[in-house]
Amino acid sequence: MNSSLKTSILSPVRWVGVLVLFSLFGSVALAQKAPRVTQHKLRILHTTDVHGNIFPYDFLNDRPGTGSMSRLSTVLREIRRTDPETLLLDAGDLLQGEPPTYYYNYVDTLSTHIVSSAMNYLGYDAVAMGNHDIEPGHSVFDKWGRECKFPLIAANIISDKTGEPYFKPYHVFTRAGLRVAVLGFTTPAIPQWVPAHLWEGLHFDDILTSAAHWVPLIQEREKPDLLVVLMHSGLENDNPDYLENAGRALANKGMGIDLLLIGHDHRQELEWIRPEGSTTDSVLLINPANHLDRVADIQITVRKEGGRVVSKQLVPSFISLEGVEPDSVFLRHFAQEYAAVNDYLATEVGELASEVRGEDALFGTTPYMDVIHRMQLESVGAEISFAAPLKTSAVLPAGKVYVRDLFKFCPFSNFLYAMQLTGREIRGYLEHSYAGWAATSITEDGGLIRLRPGAQPTDKYKTFVPPYNYSAAQGIDYTVDLSKPEGERVTILRLTGHSEPFDLDRTYRVAVN
C-alpha cells in the first residue's frame, strides 16, 4: 500500500455521532429560516372638540350636563384595567367653549390651567392643536404647552423665525411591542378667523403639502409599525380658497397612513376610504364629534413575522358617555377649581325687564341682538354694527343677569373691531349674509330660512349656512325683499335717526366681531 495514501474508516458509533450533528445543524438552519411570528394588540381612544367640557355640569343653565372629562375618567379606569397600554389622543379645540376655559384663560392666569391639569390627570398621550387652542393667544397656549405632560403636535404650524414646526410635528410611542408614529396637523384656515397678533410669528402650511413632506420622512426615519394622523380638520372641504377640512383629501392620498383621527367639523364620522390607485388597502377615518358625548375606540391587531408587519386589523367603534356616572375621584380632585369657576359665574352684572330668546334673531330684530349691537356701537364709536346670533338656543329669563348668562350671548371669546367700509361694501356684505340665511323664495310651508338641499327634520345641521353666520346690521334702516334675485334684495335707506339717504360711495365706521 502506498504510504502516502491514507484512508479512514469510521466505526458505526462515530457514524451515528456525525448524523446527529448534521441533524442538529439542519434543525438550527430550519429554525433560522422560519421567521418568528408575533401578534400585537393595541387600543387607541380618540376625543376631539371637547371645548372645555370638563365637569358634568351645564354652567350656563345651572343644571347637570352631558359628556365631560369626568365621565371619560370613569371609562378610562375600566379600560386601563384590561388594556393598560391604551393610547389616549385628542384632535384639538380644548381651550375655548365653556366657562372653565374662559376663567383660566383670562381671569385666573397664574394657576395651572384647568385643561392641562385635567388632561394630565387623565393621562392623555398627545394632542393636535385646534383653531380654538390658538385663538386665546400666545400667552395662553404657550403656558398650556409648558404645563402639559404630553406633546402638543402640529407639523403645519410653522415658526417664521426658524422655518420649522413651532410645536412638535409628531411623536413615536412604543406600546404593546409596536412603534406607533402619531403625526399632527391643524386646519390652515386659522388666519381667516383669528387676529394675527394672537399667532404672531407663525404661519400655517397646507395639510396635504405638509403631509407629503412628513409622512415619507417618518417612514424612513422612524420605521413605524403604525402611522396615525391626528388632525384638527374635518372630512369634506367646501371652501375653494383653502383646504380647511382635509380628511377625505388626505385619505385619498394614502401615503401609507393607517388611521386618520379627525375633528373640527363637530360631525360623527366613521368611514373606510380607499386611496386613489389602491386596490386593496383602505384608510380608516373616524371622528367622535364634539362635547365628549362619545369617544372613538379603535382596537388594532398587528401580526409580525420576523419583526416585519404582515397584517393589520383595525376594528373601530364609539363609546357613548350617555348614562356613564362621573368619576367621583376626579370630581373631588378638581373640587377647588369647580368652586372657583362657579363663584365667578354667580357674579351679578345687571337685570332684564323681559325674557330674551336667541331663536328670535333668526326672523327679525330682537332684544338678544339689540344688546350685542348696542355694546359694539358704543365700545368703538361706530355708526353701524354687524353681528350674528352666536347661540340661537339661548334663553334669558326676566330678572337678574349673572356672568354665566353672558356666555349665552357669546360662548366664544370673539374680538371686536372697527372697520372703515364704503356703503357699497356694507350692502354687499348684507347681500352675502342673506344669500345664505334667507330662502330663495317663500317655500310652500312658509319657511323663511334657507335649508340644505335634502335636509331632514332630524338632521343636526339643517340650514344652508350655520346661524352664527347670519349677520344683520344695526345703525341703518334697511329692507330685505325675498321676491328679488340674490344680490338685489337689500335696500339701505338711511342711517338710523338721520334723514339723509344712505350713500353707497361714502365710508362708514362699522363694528364687527
How would you describe each model-predicted region?
Residues 31-323, 363-375, 385:
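Acidic, metal/ion-coordinating pockets
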Residues 221-224, 230, 345-349, 383-389, ...:
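Flexible, glycine/charged-enriched surface loops at secondary-structure junctions
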